[in-house]
Amino acid sequence: MTTKTRFAPSPTGFLHVGGARTALYSWLQARANNGEFVLRIEDTDIERSTQAACDAILEGMNWLGLTWDEGPYYQTKRFDRYNEIIAQMLAKGTAYKCYCSRERIDALREAQAANGEAQKYDGCCRDLPARDTDEPFVVRFKNPIGGSVVFDDHVRGRIEFSNDALDDLIIARTDGVPTYNFCVVVDDWDMGITCVVRGEDHINNTPRQINILKALGAPIPEYAHVSMILGDDGAKLSKRHGAVSVMQYRDDGYLPEALLNYLVRLGWSHGDQEIFSLEEMKQYFKLGDINKAASAFNTDKLVWLNQHYIKSLAPEYVATHLQWHMDDQKIDLSNGPALAEVVTALAERAKTLKELAASSRYFYEDFAEFDEAQAKKHLRGVALEPLQLVQQKLAALTEWTVEAIHQAIEDTATELDVGMGKVGMPLRVAVTGAGQSPGLDITLFLIGRSRSEQRISKAIEFVADRINS
């Protein structure tokens, strides 16, 4: 039987890290078993579902590279199918109309709470004969009485629920809109889902859904309920820990490979290995290797992984993601080096693409003034002679290459009998406006000959003015 999994988010908010991890695990379960992955949008909460959230979910999935084989399916477009099944269940007696008022239900719950009993529907309308009336009603599923629901969870092992602890679930509201738990069952059945991967907050839904599947004569999928993600302080993950939308991580300068690698390790492991390509994830992933314990979100670990991927992935590929940040920071690339060359030069120092973009501006744009602290330290009177001599040697070069530039800087230091820093630091501030850059040879090469010479001249004027002031 072909493995078929699904990711079924509700579009009441953006795709967050918890949902993204669930999507990844479900996607990997399909890919690791040469199966199929379905994307389903569970939008039956009409009041809270938004198109913006739907779009953000799709954008996040695409950015992560979690491609789907079917879908996206929308539950709101399948109401006719749900109502068809509800009608069949009413006719077969596996569901019934409940006419109990809100007041009666509230009073029942209050009495049960006062008596220390579990709050559940008492089956008042369960065996009433059909009636022809205009009274409002909900449709309830006739949950089995007695016995238990048992399933083997890939993550948690054997789980058992007593049917007596389950009440008769509402499967259609008074307005005729089918409920979440019912739609999920019909969808999983119709779409041939063989394995459901979802958060542990759905465990209590599982016995109810299994009972409905049995009533429909539908096959029961396998289940894997993954633990929640906590902040590094042990509290439930919130925005202050990093529970932001997936696309916010893109905006903050993370590569999808880094986020995927981080998320897969947030509860799953394969020996002591930390770095996983997507192909390796597919090769090694098993649901049974997911840890039952909650996992703590650690932003420092994510940053470390991001640094690794910025340095190790092909510069041309990193440049395709860096382009978004250059555009976002309004850096015009038309007058400067190829972006992949900048990635090669700056990757070693960069923690994020956002940071990398900001630090690359001087390759493409002239700066209005030197960094005040760096200029005060390095563009002093003592810097005038090194700057003038290195300017002469650079101007005399017959070719503008990294090797030739390096030799010119080295020859300047030798001729003046000073350390490289006495030449390099004033030159660095001169051409970048700041105190940090890659090697000066590659920096000047990428800035370009004309622009480098202009900036050195500007720095010489700056130093001369300081001497004369």
From Swiss-Prot:
Function: Catalyzes the attachment of glutamate to tRNA(Glu) in a two-step reaction: glutamate is first activated by ATP to form Glu-AMP and then transferred to the acceptor end of tRNA(Glu).
Binding of Zn(2+), residues: 98, 100, 125, 127
Sections of the chain in a coiled coil: none
The encoding gene: gltX
Positions occupied by motif 'KMSKS' region: 236-240
GO cellular component: cytosol
Stated name of the protein: Glutamate--tRNA ligase
Taxon lineage: Bacteria, Pseudomonadati, Pseudomonadota, Gammaproteobacteria, Alteromonadales
Swiss-Prot/TrEMBL keywords: Aminoacyl-tRNA synthetase, ATP-binding, Cytoplasm, Ligase, Metal-binding, Nucleotide-binding, Protein biosynthesis, Zinc
PANTHER family: GLUTAMATE--TRNA LIGASE, GLUTAMATE--TRNA LIGASE, MITOCHONDRIAL-RELATED
Family according to the record: Belongs to the class-I aminoacyl-tRNA synthetase family. Glutamate--tRNA ligase type 1 subfamily.
